[in-house]
Structure formats: C-alpha cells, structure tokens
Amino acid sequence: MISAAWFGYPAEELTTIAVTGTKGKTTTTYMVKSLLEEAGHKVGVIGTIEVVIGQEHIPVNNTTPESYDIHSYFRKMAEEDCDVVVMEASSQGFKLDRTAGIMFDYGLFTNLSPDHIGPNEHKDFAEYLSCKAKLFNQCRYGYANIDDEHFAEITKNATCPIETFGLNENADLVAYDVELTRDRDFLGVDFGLKGTCEGKISCGVPGTFNVHNALGAISIAGHMGVTVEQMNKALRHFSVKGRVQIVPTGYDYTLIIDYAHNAVALESILNTLRAYDPPRLISLFGCGGNRSKLRRYEMGEVSGKLADFTIITSDNPRFEEPQAIIDDILIGMKKTDGEYISIIDRHEAISYALHHAQPGDIVVLAGKGHETYQEIEGKKYHMSEEEIVQDVLDGKY
C-alpha cells in the first residue's frame, strides 16, 4: 500500500490482469499480450522471463517482484502510454503479500499441480493451493479452468464473479473439435469456440494443453472487445521464447526448446509432442545442482518411459559434480526400458542430438528454455541454446 501511494497509485491508470497457476502462466500471459496488441492496446508485462515496458526488456529473477518494484514498473508503464499490464502472479508473491493492495481488473487461473513445496517455499500442497486461491479475492472479474481437478477448491471462496473455460460443455467458453496440426517447422492446434466467443481458432503453439492457455487468454481478450479475426492473427504465429519454442533448422525434423525443468512439466511436454505421432521422440535434459535429488530420479523415469531416446546432460550444476547429477538421473532412467546416452557437456549433447535426428523426429531440448547462461561453481557463463543450435547447423560442432 505504501509503495502504491509512493508512486501515485499507478495501477489505477492501467487495466491490470494477473495470471496464476502451476503451468502455463508465461505462455498465457504472452498470449493475452499478443491478443490485446493485435486490437491496438499497448501492453506491459511483468513475468518470469522479463519485464516489458514499451521497447524496454528488463531481465528478472523472481516470478513476482517485490511490491515496491511492481508499483515502480506500473508507474513506468503508465508514463510509456501503456494502457494494460499483464503479470504473472506466483503463489510466493501472494504468500509474501507482494501484490497486497492491488485490485486487479481481471484474474486468470490456469491449473494446479504439486510444485514449489519445500522448506523455502510452501510447507504443503494445502498452503500452495490457498495462496493461489487468493487471486480471486483480489480481482474484479475472475476466469478459471473448469477442467482442472482443483477448480472447485480454487474458486470456492472467490469474492468476484467467475467465468469458466475448458473442454467441459458446462464452461462459459468451450473449445470443441480440437485438432493437432503439423508441418516441418510448425506444430499447432486448431479448435472451435462456443459460448462467450464463437468461431474457429488456429493456434501456433503445440498440444491440447495449450488449448486451455489460449482459452484463458481468449476469455479476457473477448471481454475487452478483441474479435475472433484479431485473435487468429495474434495466435497463428504466436511463440514465447523458451516455452515450446520451435527452432527452424531447415531439416525434416522438428526442434523445440522448452523450459520443462521438473517431472510434471517434462511429462506434460513429452505427452504433448507424442500426440503428433513422430517416428521418434528425443528428449535432452539435465537437472540443476544443489536442488532436490527426487526431481532427478523422477525426470529420469519420466523421460525413460515417454521418450524413444534420451540424452542426459548438464543443466546448471552449480556446486555439484555434473557426473554425480547424471548418476542420480540414471537411477530413475534405469527403472525403465528407455534407450539413453549421457554426454556431460551440453554443447556436445545438443550437437549429438541434431546430428542423429532423422526425418520426422521431434527433438526437445528441455530445462533451460529462455535462460542464456549455465551456472557452474557460483558463476554464470553465457550459454544460449539457440546459438548452439545455429553453431551446429553452421558446422562448428
């Protein structure tokens, strides 16, 4: 509240939109941005990857910044003639009251699954859920995924009207006739809309999972007057850096960079890509050092079960030995019949993946996503997977 007053209550000069959920926050946030910009709005973003104010892109470390920073960003956005801000609202942000005192115009809930539970985050799933549910006590209009198993718990104490979206016929906005579409450097999904919006949508983000992200964004955009024609223009070629990001290679396989860095996210993307029925699905990933060992076992087992071939490599080893992390991943991998190879150096691992990809394959580089560094022994070294891919294609690896 003090921060809001200090900056002259800038939130009152903007249409404020908050997106919360375990998965899909970033994708949905940028979908909302694209949809509203197609209709002529100037949209600021406060997200996991960055803060966007006009042409300025500011890298960030926390999903939800401190209260002072949020209102500082709001003020800069208002001064840059933004009329809308979309922000990712994390459970930690609600727990630590970083968004206290902001009455969002629109609040959007994507989904909920166990994550961020531990000594430095939430003590248990019940606390995690209750923090997410705070959004619907802090907005004027709420939008929620009716297909999520925790929908009823998330919305039961809402103090705002809730509009629903999903594949469920009882939703206010329903997607139907969902169809996956594929070309060499394109994976997408088409679907019809009925309810609060009517028409056909072609979305350039892979998987039925992203139908829910699109529906959430469309719900808000429709409320703000965006037409179905404008929605299609925005979504057909939509992409978010490091989130199921297709990287063109010029070859007859599909290469994807994705931020999936835990078992839930890896399982989700591998199932999503398997639905496109590739001859082979190749998964490349590592796990962060000085983090939960359980995550390593789980990710190894998930990839072993769901990918045709796994390349186990380094992520951010931090202060651990990369080989020790790989050995932990192998404990999970060896519970399965999955084929694998381990290559410690991530550059070499990516080179191996591209040189061994065959026509029709889908190759996913998981874990790093938008990150452009590798953290080793307390130092962050520059490492961009897009640049590595280009180097491989240019024959440097």
Model-derived regions, located:
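Acidic, Mg2+-coordinating active-site environments of NTP-dependent enzymes
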Residues: 14, 78-80, 95, 105-255, ...
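Short SAM/SAH-binding signature in class I
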Residues: 84, 105-106, 216, 358-364
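Phosphate-binding loop of NTP-binding sites
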Residues: 1-146, 150-158
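Generic beta-sheet signal
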Residues: 46, 110, 145, 165-167, ...
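ATP-dependent carboxylate-amine ligase
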Residues: 159, 196, 219-233, 239-240, ...
